[in-house]
Amino acid sequence: MSSQLEQIFARLRGSADFEGVDFSDINACGIDGDNPLHCVVRWGDIAAAKILISAGIDVNKAGDLSYTPLHVACMNGNVEMVKLLVDNGADLFAFNEGDLPFTTARIAGHDQICEFLAPLMQKLQSGDSPIWVRARIAQLRREIARLEASLEGK
């Protein structure tokens, strides 16, 4: 493990959410379900996000309230972070508890992020429609399975 990763994990271990978490799996989650990328996005730490992404962290991991790191960046209004995540495969159509990252940015009043995301979303939707529909169906099936699993645990 690189010293840069170790520094990020040391900072995370300092929070109650990640106390005792084994970071031998880079996607290890804290008690609220967030992975390290959620946290560095929340911190606005672009350099740390790049380190985690290059180390193979899941950029689409749903954490607390089903927020992905992209939802967090959109909520916080960090345009540079949004661009970094999108450039590294963040799902523009990931749902949290009912909202897309675009909607999260719109509700938070981050118009610059909406202006960045809208044409990308339109381009994806206007592409090869059958492929897009199949991808959305697969994504929705995963979300339904996740929600059903969470209901079984209650």
How would you describe each model-predicted region?
Residues R13-V21, D45-I53, N78-V86, H110-A118:
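Ankyrin repeat structural motif
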Residues M1-R13, R106-K154:
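Ankyrin-repeat-protein effector appendages
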Residues A10-R13, C39-G44, V72-N78, T104-H110:
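Ankyrin repeat A-helix N-terminal signature
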Residues G30, G63, F95-N96:
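Ankyrin repeat boundary/linker residues
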Residues M1-A48:
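N-terminal segments that cap or nucleate solenoid repeat domains
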